[in-house]
Curated annotation (Swiss-Prot):
Lipid bilayer topology: Peripheral membrane protein
Self-association and partners: Monomer.
Lineage of source species: Bacteria, Pseudomonadati, Thermodesulfobacteriota, Desulfovibrionia, Desulfovibrionales
GO biological process: ribosomal small subunit assembly
Organism, as annotated: Nitratidesulfovibrio vulgaris (strain ATCC 29579 / DSM 644 / CCUG 34227 / NCIMB 8303 / VKM B-1760 / Hildenborough)
Protein name per Swiss-Prot or TrEMBL: GTPase Era
Sequence segments annotated as region (G3): 62-65
Amino acid sequence: MNQTTHRCGWVALIGPPNAGKSTLLNALIGQKVAIVTSKPQTTRNQIVGILSRKDAQVVFMDTPGIHQLRGRLNKMLLQTAWQSMNAADALIVMLDGDLYIRKPDLLDRDIAPLVEPIAAETRPVVVVVNKIDLFRDKSKMLPLLERLSAMWPKAEVFPASALNKDGMDHLLRLIVGYMPEGPALYPEDQISTLPVRFMTAEIVREKVFNKLRQELPYSTAVDIEQWEEEEGRDQVIVNAVIYVARPSHKSMVIGKGGATIKEIGIEARKDIQELLEKRVHLELWVKVREGWTEDLGFMRSLGLSPDE
């Protein structure tokens, strides 16, 4: 009697900032495990999402965008991305097709740290050219696809839309086929290895970014200071602190008469309740901590620093 082969392995999602890696991860898992904003470089940790099927379990690692910026926080983000890449059985390189079709000269700049490592890879590599939903005339993508195929001849290059889930079935067939044979590493109902407190903090941070968009710089972090589950009540009490680097940033987050932080709290509470499947009492506070993006000890306390 033949038994169906079960496969299990790790996949790293890498690429420049704002390519859509977190949107892709959520689309592949079928649930929200990574925050999604319109601002680049919002993924700071290695976000792990788990897809379980009868024939396979794939553990996806969403990583901070690979870029060449300076500063201790940015160097830490880059280190996290490379660590995930080294641990994977296969790689997905995510690129913003819309950006590089409109501005092809930016491609060399944005993928410079990836060109040689990907060309030398012996593991399977899939290059996903994302955001094809923005183009009615698909022939406009051909020059970019041909350029990438010539750059990385061993990789599988194809267009997709993480937002509309176009190409996801094809991507999953490829990825599952690349995974080594083996039993599942996690229970089939587990979709992430992240603690719920961390995911809660990420939801709050997502709402801050989306609410303030271009006005707020990246020097924002969220820490859960209190987490209390009341016995006999289907409710969780959460107190979260939003850290900013300047007093002027604090005013932005709070807003006139507290209007902005109230809206952030309402939107965050909704998503947290969906995550926990419980009622949530959420209190948000804003504190100034100048220079925190260069304070390695503080970043470690927030769980932002990778193992060294």
